[in-house]
A protein has these predicted regions:
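Active-site neighborhoods and metal-handling regions in enzymes and metal-associated proteins
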Residues: 1-100
Length: 100
């Protein structure tokens, strides 16, 4: 939501991921802005004090890979609104499993 920092978004994403099945989850960043470039500022990472304002677009992602097991990629694109955010994704929340 507006007024939060990119670092606070990182902290929330890490907390939610750890509380929901991956307690040892570690990342140096878990998202980025989307603007002129696909990977734009801010960086959703520790130390990024960029304050979110309405109209900013962010990609929040929590990929996880484990040798011998496989991987999972959770990713949402949101636009910051006056009172929170609006999801731009149209895929829903269903888990898609790819058999290899």
């Amino acid at each position: 939501k507006p007024g939060m920092t990119a670092e606070e978004v990182f902290d929330i994403a890490m907390k939610v991921t750890r509380e929901n099945g991956i307690p040892h989850y570690e990342r140096h960043h878990c998202g980025h802005g989307i603007g002129v470039e696909c990977y734009d500022l801010p960086s959703v990472a520790p130390g990024d004090k960029t304050v979110l304002v309405p109209g900013m677009t962010l990609n929040v992602e929590t990929p996880y890979y484990e040798l011998g097991w496989g991987g999972v990629q959770m990713e949402n694109t949101v636009v910051v609104t006056e009172d929170g955010c609006r999801y731009l994704d149209k895929g829903g929340d269903a888990l898609i499993v790819l058999e290899v």
